């Protein structure tokens, strides 16, 4: 089921913001109702061993910098497109989805119902995260717990992000994944960065700092590479080519 802490931010419209299109909220309410009905039943059905072994947890960065437009139209849109392509092509195995900013939340536990994950994915944005910031460590810890809860002795973790701000804590969390659940990083964004355009529900303005200057988040590839080297994670840059999906469509060796 969806993380209870995230549910209010998915379903409740903050009164201090302008009104938003109700269709995504209605869609999400429908999806949640389906999950509520199906959840207990699916948990009682043991998954085939091969399906449990081909388990993938996708970890999506929902910090404000993901609204930067240095990759058109934004880092977040490109990340969602990549996840969408992956889910549509991934016909076997179980997939889970976690989002993180200042904390981490499970959008979906490990499941073979990719259509439901896709429906939830379209609604996600930084403005719904309860805590600001960028903390990868709790997301990696949560990923491991999803594998354990699903009875998956092996699996893979794919993190789509533009930074690793809490490297020491994230390294500790990554070490707990060990060889059972190897970690991969997919970086989205550029070294030059770009302004962060806020969504229409927040006035369609650009994010500014306390001095009124535009916030332009640049991707520090060197820092991410250092984290990848220290954690043993593989590292790639996000692109939307279909051939880049092949590694995620085959069960791990």
Give the role of each language-model region.
Residues 165-178, 185:
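Solvent-exposed, extracytoplasmic
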Residues 39-155, 169-171:
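Membrane-embedded segments
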Residues 108-110, 168-171, 195-199, 248:
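Short, well-ordered secondary-structure micro-motifs
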Residues 64-65, 102-106, 163-166, 189-193, ...:
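Solvent-exposed loop/turn segments at secondary-structure junctions
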Residues 156-160:
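A cross-kingdom signal targeting lumenal/periplasmic-facing segments of multi-pass membrane
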Residues 178-253:
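Von Willebrand factor type A / integrin I
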Residues 5-8, 53-54, 197-202:
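Short, glycine-rich, amphipathic interfacial segments at transmembrane boundaries or analogous
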Residues 1-30, 34, 248-249, 253:
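Juxtamembrane linker/hinge segments adjacent to transmembrane helices in membrane proteins
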